[in-house]
From Swiss-Prot:
<keyword id="KW-1003">Cell membrane</keyword>
<comment type="function">
    <text>Channel that opens in response to stretch forces in the membrane lipid bilayer. May participate in the regulation of osmotic pressure changes within the cell.</text>
</comment>
<keyword id="KW-0812">Transmembrane</keyword>
<comment type="similarity">
    <text>Belongs to the MscL family.</text>
</comment>
<comment type="subunit">
    <text>Homopentamer.</text>
</comment>
<protein>
    <recommendedName>
        <fullName>Large-conductance mechanosensitive channel</fullName>
    </recommendedName>
</protein>
<keyword id="KW-0406">Ion transport</keyword>
<dbReference type="Pfam" id="PF01741">
    <property type="entry name" value="MscL"/>
</dbReference>
<keyword id="KW-0997">Cell inner membrane</keyword>
<keyword id="KW-0472">Membrane</keyword>
<dbReference type="GO" id="GO:0008381">
    <property type="term" value="F:mechanosensitive monoatomic ion channel activity"/>
</dbReference>
<feature type="transmembrane region" description="Helical">
    <location>
        <begin position="79"/>
        <end position="99"/>
    </location>
</feature>
<dbReference type="InterPro" id="IPR001185">
    <property type="entry name" value="MS_channel"/>
</dbReference>
<keyword id="KW-0813">Transport</keyword>
<feature type="transmembrane region" description="Helical">
    <location>
        <begin position="9"/>
        <end position="29"/>
    </location>
</feature>
<dbReference type="InterPro" id="IPR036019">
    <property type="entry name" value="MscL_channel"/>
</dbReference>
<keyword id="KW-0407">Ion channel</keyword>
Length: 139
């Protein structure tokens, strides 16, 4: 029973739940970016370049023979994937930059130090009195 309770404690920690939410949102965001690049950015870019469909760009290394498919380097899909990556990396960079800015603003306004308790005040006074007595005794 101890292992189950340990797993439960681990699974409901804030960091684990936050990580799971981040992974799910990241996967959904990746799909959105892929659609954005493939369906919105690449077609106009292909027209500007001269009517090129990037998904069809490939180099055939060996033609298909019978049931054996062709060996192809699909560099157009690779270009599209690189553009996906650049957009995702930029979005993550902007998100991290915004979070860091918020953290810096919090750090600029530190909270006031807590006021000492009556016991701490009394101990401080006793310490100061002892220091002054010791200084008076030294030649």
């Amino acid at each position: 029973m101890g292992m189950i309770s340990e797993f439960k404690a681990f699974a409901v920690k804030g960091n684990v739940v936050d990580m799971a939410v981040g992974i799910i949102i990241g996967a959904a965001f990746g799909k959105i970016v892929s659609s954005f690049v493939g369906d919105i950015i690449m077609p106009p870019l292909g027209i500007l370049i001269g009517g090129v469909d990037f998904s069809d760009l490939a180099i055939t290394l060996k033609a298909a023979e019978g049931d054996i498919p062709a060996v192809v380097l699909a560099y157009g899909k690779f270009i599209q994937t690189v553009i996906d990556f650049v957009i995702v990396a930029f979005a993550i960079f902007m998100g991290v930059k915004a979070i860091n800015r918020l953290k810096r603003e919090e750090a600029v306004a530190p909270s006031a130090p807590p006021t000492p308790t009556p016991q701490e005040t009394l101990l401080t006074e006793i310490r100061d009195l002892l220091k002054s007595q010791n200084q008076n005794r030294l030649p």
